Amino acid sequence: MTHEEILTLLGDYVDYLIANSSAEAPMWNIEKVRSGKPNKWNYIDGCMITACLSLYKTTGDEKYLSFSKDFIDFFVQEDGSIKTYDPKEYNLDNVNQGKNLFTLYDIYGDEKYRRAIDTIRSQLLTQPRTKEGNFWHKDIYPWQVWLDGTYMAQPFYMEYETRYNKMQGCIDSYKQFMNIKKHMRDEKTGLYYHGYDESRQMYWADPVTGCSPNFWLRAMGWFMVAMVDVLERMDEQLYNEYRGIMAQLRQTIEDVHKFQDEETGMFWQVMDHPGAEGNYLETSGTALFAYAVLKGVRLGYLPKRMAAWAEKAFYGTCDRYLSKNPDGSLQLDGICLVAGLGGKDHRDGSLAYYFSEPVVCNDAKGVGPLVLAYTEMIARK
């Protein structure tokens, strides 16, 4: 396919997904589809609605906005409560969808969105923390920091503090990024480990460093986008902190780029084991890299030369994994369904573990980031 054909196909693909989805039955939430349970407020749908709202902002097409509003309105009640969401679950994943409430509030001015924003903020006010001050990833994972959690919570936190709290929590957010750099960055590769256990008690944690053993691509992807999204919401008056996160972002992109597959432009599921048996070129993390870099270049956080790396990742992913079925339906393959640490399935962070998780098509953890990268691509035109 030519680049123009890919961009056209992606536009058709998004339209296909939203035409076949609702808040009760999102086609892109494969975990929900497989479970057979009613849908809940969750980060996976949050990724897709963020992508739809971004498409609206870029194209001006109202269908993306009205779909997003209907989706969110299924959950958000007039009093600001959110159906199926419990702040006291203390799960950072559940904060992710909250970013979209700011957008809807700005467009519609409906106070229920403002109240719902406060509902989600209430979770972060009492979210358990490590001794150094980082949010626990979930209440059920005590003393643990996961890279994923930076994307799930920090952009919402930074936006709330900047808009409504006189920037009081902004330096706290910055410090959480610096703690992650201190504890989770590998000096040799520049990559960050998926998880960190401050208590050093988990079976997956290194007894000295507290880190999990491997570099999972999607976790790195979430982390890169988190830095871009936080900078976008941060006031430049916070001179040192703003530049500190920007420097961290630039260094991370430089380090990650070294692991980009020369032929395809993609990245491997476990980043530093290219070609290992069971390893594969993975869609979601590659798309997150493309989006983080394209957006970072557009907003001036990253040098323009990096855009070529992102375009190679974007088109490489589409060439390899985006296809049209004989019945006219479209699909995006090569998406790792899920990966975590600990829990009842004894997820140990080993290579064998990351290679064993299901690889699926059309899940929003891959679709959402690719569509976000697509919005950046069409904005460049």
Place the predicted regions along the sequence by residue.
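CBM-like carbohydrate-recognition segments
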Residues: 2-44, 63-65, 74-92, 96-98, ...
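Long, well-ordered core segments of solenoidal/helical folds
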Residues: 7-26, 66-83, 115-134, 167-203, ...
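Core register positions within helices of long alpha-helical scaffolds
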Residues: 51, 58, 100, 107, ...
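Inter-helical turn/loop segments and adjacent helix faces that build the functional surface
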Residues: 59, 108, 160-171, 230-243, ...
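Acidic/His metal-coordination segments adjacent to aromatic residues that form catalytic metal sites
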Residues: 76-83, 134-139, 199-213, 268-278, ...
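Extracytoplasmic mature domains of secreted/periplasmic and thylakoid-lumen proteins
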Residues: 87, 92-154
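Short, contiguous, pocket-lining structural segments
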Residues: 145-152, 165, 169-172, 207-223, ...
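Oxyanion-binding "anion nests"
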Residues: 224-274, 278
